[in-house]
Curated annotation (Swiss-Prot):
Taxonomic path: Bacteria, Bacillati, Bacillota, Bacilli, Lactobacillales
Gene symbol of the encoding locus: mutM
Protein name (database record): Formamidopyrimidine-DNA glycosylase
Source organism per UniProt: Streptococcus pyogenes serotype M3 (strain ATCC BAA-595 / MGAS315)
Amino-acid positions noted as binding DNA in the UniProt annotation, renumbered to this chain: H91, R110
Active-site residues, record numbering mapped to chain: P2 (schiff-base intermediate with dna), E3 (proton donor), K58 (proton donor), R262 (proton donor)
Cofactors named for this entry: Zn(2+)
């Protein structure tokens, strides 16, 4: 699943490709992807001009002025821009024809991606309903708030970080990286973390997600950015996908566990499980 660094990289690519373009027609082949009224979606988008492309957590925000098209890539979603003819592909599901003759295509092998067309004035309520946590920046991701939320919960730390309420944008890859960097076992109850561990989790979340953005995201399976290029963050992953390799910090072999139903990579020496 594209996580915050991948979605931010897609956002930057889309802004380069479609900023200022007018949508003249929309073709939707998988109606279930649209979570708001289908007729409104089909009739309202033509004539709209793409004013900016933003992001909140793992959501892309295509700003149309008074409206925002909220796009979530889920497991396999990606955007492609074709300057003229669009090739046949059974995984191409949404087509945005632009006034300059090009077509922005949403591709999704799993068909899990979603679209919501909402009034810009309703955007805050949209994310509040989903209990989406703050962006992972020093200005918004406050240590004291993070600490209070952790210490009041019995949830294991990995599923807690994944649920998007503590901080927006973390997925399986980057949670494994953050937990390793902070020397925290993924099954540790949130309330049992000490202040030093909480601070490390906070600081490493900010650092690692920023590094992921800098490196253009991780191409581990099928991720490509909006320009069709791979990311390079996979070359900087310390534990995710490194089963059997030596821990870069202590030399112990990395092992793979199941935590909350998710494949999880840890160093058993650096990330000791509490009794």
């Amino acid at each position: 699943m594209p996580e915050l660094p991948e979605v931010e990289t897609v956002r930057r690519g889309l802004e380069t490709l479609v900023l200022g373009q007018e949508i003249v027609a929309v073709t939707l082949k998988v109606p279930k992807m649209v979570k708001t009224d289908l007729e409104t979606f089909a009739l309202t988008l033509p004539g709209q001009i793409i004013q900016s492309v933003g992001r909140r957590g793992k959501y892309l925000l295509i700003d149309l002025g008074q409206l925002v098209l909220v796009s979530h890539l889920r497991m396999e979603g990606k955007y492609l821009l074709f300057p003229d003819e669009v090739p046949d592909n059974k995984h191409f599901h949404v087509f945005f024809e632009l006034k300059n003759g090009s077509t922005l295509v949403y591709q999704d092998v799993r068909k899990f991606g979603t679209f919501d067309l909402i009034a810009k004035s309703q955007l805050s309520a949209f994310f509040a309903k989903r209990k989406l946590g703050p962006e992972p920046k020093k200005e918004t991701f406050k240590l004291k708030t993070f600490e209070a939320a952790l210490l009041s919960s019995q949830k294991p730390i990995k599923p807690h970080l994944l649920d998007q309420t503590l901080v927006a944008g973390l997925g399986n890859i980057y949670v494994d990286e953050v937990l390793w960097a902070a020397k925290v076992h993924p099954e540790t109850a949130s309330s049992r973390l000490n202040k030093a561990e909480i601070k490390r989790l906070h600081d490493e979340t900010i650092r690692i997600l920023a590094l992921g953005i800098e490196k253009g995201g991780s191409t581990v399976r099928t991720y490509r950015n909006a320009l069709g290029a791979d990311g390079t963050m996979q070359d900087y992953l310390q534990v995710y996908g490194q089963t059997g390799k030596s821990c870069p910090r202590c030399g112990q072999a990395i092992v793979k566990l199941k935590v909350g139903g998710r494949g999880t990579h840890i160093c058993p020496k650096c990330q000791k499980k509490r009794p």
